[in-house]
């Protein structure tokens, strides 16, 4: 099977700097190049990498652990009367920057959370996944997310049929 691209550009040529007027596609993955990389985007990338070089990754990881531990503690405190089960490791050293809980009605609960601006993720059959980006997630955001989960469970607004409809993206 030969893959082809509908968009061809001069960098997809076998020898782009020969400036041959007849297009001869490269035989490697290079044939999928469309044109010159955007110089401005590379400048932005370089600037962002300069910022990243100044970051203390240990401090970022520590904040990640604090955010996820706070979320677990708040959810277990606020929602103790609901059938939520922590699926992620309790030990923050054993998990990344995400926390998963299971609930038999995970899909509509996550859809209700998303409708209330708490953006999480659902994984079949019953997982509610929450990601925490330590560079910009605030402790207040964690408290608000846990509070909204409690509100949705308490009011049972997740039972509204609008949240039951299947979607391609969770």
Segment roles from a protein language model:
Residues 1-63, 69, 160, 170:
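Active-site C-terminal subdomain of aminotransferase-like
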Residues 49-52, 75, 149, 153:
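Hydrophobic residues within well-ordered, non-membrane alpha-helices that form the packing/core
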Residues 107, 112-170:
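PLP-dependent enzyme catalytic core of the Aspartate aminotransferase-like
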Residues 28-35, 52-102:
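Conserved small-domain helix->loop->beta segment predominantly found in fold-type I
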Residues 41, 91-93, 122-126:
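Short, flexible turn/loop "capping" segments at secondary-structure junctions
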Residues 49, 88-90, 103, 124, ...:
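Active-site proximal loops enriched in glycine and acidic residues that flank catalytic Cys/His/Asp
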């Amino acid at each position: 099977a030969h893959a082809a691209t509908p968009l061809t550009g001069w960098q997809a040529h076998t020898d782009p700097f020969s400036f041959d007027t007849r297009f001869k596609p490269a035989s490697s993955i290079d044939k999928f190049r469309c044109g010159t990389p955007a110089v401005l985007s590379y400048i932005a990338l370089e600037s962002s990498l300069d910022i990243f070089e100044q970051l203390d990754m240990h401090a970022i990881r520590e904040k990640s652990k604090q955010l996820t531990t706070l979320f677990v503690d708040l959810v277990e405190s606020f929602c103790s009367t609901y059938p939520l089960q922590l699926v992620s490791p309790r030990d923050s050293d054993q998990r990344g920057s995400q926390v998963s809980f299971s609930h038999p009605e995970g899909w509509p609960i996550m859809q209700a959370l998303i409708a209330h601006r708490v953006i999480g993720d659902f994984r079949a059959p019953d997982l509610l996944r929450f990601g925490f980006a330590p560079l910009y997630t605030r402790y207040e955001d964690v408290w608000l997310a846990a509070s909204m989960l409690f509100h949705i469970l308490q009011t049972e607004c997740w039972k509204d049929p609008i949240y039951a409809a299947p979607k391609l993206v969770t």
